[in-house]
């Protein structure tokens, strides 16, 4: 059944909530920030751990976040997942502290933006598919008189790759991982509602794949969105809240209500 999954987004060493489409590689470009926490990353790690919110992730959005990420991970070793700048060279290091590592941009060529399968194969060999999460954060691409499609975006969601989300893509990638994180970059941080069409498609594309986990993020604005995702995905997809959540300065969703949902659904 659908459950609430927590996140800790780090930017310049602080816990923040950011509008996804405003992140860039340039420090000169202004990032639209919904929330900057006065509390350390370890506070949120402890909060999730004490309330048994499992499968939570720490995402390093750009440089200067390693120390903050380690602080969160060390608060409850092997409890949190970690993503952001993960490569073949450092994945072993992060797995000393994290339950799983999360990868996106590393899997694509930096110049052509093409998916490089051999990198995923090597990561799976080193980490094991049960400790590897593939981040398929995406943007909607719509053309006149055509059905919308969702294409994986890299480089802080600014660059479209050649990898389209569909049944074939998931069937292929499931050879190397058993979990996916999907940010709907177009609605991330806006608190205007989830991409219902994407959630429904995620279920459709993976309905015949056993034991695969998907966490959806982007736009959630009400605790009722847990019920909506459960309906759209037949309970197969989990949901994370960001800017709408009270622990991140939001006024739309109470953390305790999300925890209660989990306890009632998974008692």
From Swiss-Prot:
PANTHER family: 1-(5-PHOSPHORIBOSYL)-5-[(5-PHOSPHORIBOSYLAMINO)METHYLIDENEAMINO] IMIDAZOLE-4-CARBOXAMIDE ISOMERASE (PTHR43090:SF2). Its EC number is 5.3.1.16. It is found in: Cytoplasm. One of its GO terms (cellular component) is cytoplasm. It catalyses: 1-(5-phospho-beta-D-ribosyl)-5-[(5-phospho-beta-D-ribosylamino)methylideneamino]imidazole-4-carboxamide = 5-[(5-phospho-1-deoxy-D-ribulos-1-ylimino)methylamino]-1-(5-phospho-beta-D-ribosyl)imidazole-4-carboxamide. Belongs to the HisA/HisF family. It is an enzyme of class 5 (isomerase). The gene is HIS6. Pathway: Amino-acid biosynthesis; L-histidine biosynthesis; L-histidine from 5-phospho-alpha-D-ribose 1-diphosphate: step 4/9. One of its GO terms (biological process) is L-tryptophan biosynthetic process. It holds the Pfam family His_biosynth. Keywords: Amino-acid biosynthesis, Cytoplasm, Histidine biosynthesis, Isomerase. It comes from the Eukaryota. The keyword Cell wall biogenesis/degradation does not apply. This is 1-(5-phosphoribosyl)-5-[(5-phosphoribosylamino)methylideneamino] imidazole-4-carboxamide isomerase. The keyword Isomerase applies. InterPro entries: Aldolase_TIM, His6-like_euk, His_biosynth, Isoase_HisA-like, RibuloseP-bd_barrel. GO terms for molecular function: 1-(5-phosphoribosyl)-5-[(5-phosphoribosylamino)methylideneamino]imidazole-4-carboxamide isomerase activity.
